[in-house]
Amino acid sequence: MGGGAAEFYGPSDNTTFNMKGKRSDSRNLLQEWKDIQTEMNRKHVLLHTNDEFKRTDWSSVDYVLGLFAPSHLAYQLENEDQPSLAEMTEAAIKVLSRNPKGFLLLVEGGRIDHAHHVNQAQYALTETLELEKAVEKALSLVDQQETLLLVTADHSHSYGVVGYPTRDTSVLDVDNTAKVSVNSVSFLII
């Protein structure tokens, strides 16, 4: 579950998001996935909207493919109509935990990195908290004696406190002791 629906459609496909697919081979992988699930008589669901997500009875499906945006999911601060990372984690565990052999689930807070790349500290911090909520949700749903949960980063970006901000300055603001740097460019505290 996540974003990236455009990568599953060909350029001429009629898509849920009114966008052109990006597949150069013109395959509609979502239709192929649905056809395979139907052919194998599997209980499955393909989701594109938060309403579909919220209406899904997770105990009645064994296979889930949820693509809620043409590209990346929205940052949580801007998210009005997509499931949260914690909600998707919960749904995945509800489906996967019925397997008597156990399961492996990968959950990524990918928007943390995107926010760092464009110097959006508030977005990066909020996305980190969203990942924490997903971890907390996972821990609440599994037998912790039987579960190995790893939290790691594929790479990281460090935070540094820059300048000499006064105590009452938000770390998400510009340095209030010198609103511009030597070369007249404003800089964020973190």
Question: What positions do the PLM features span?
Answer:
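A post-motif C-terminal structural segment
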Residues: M1-I190
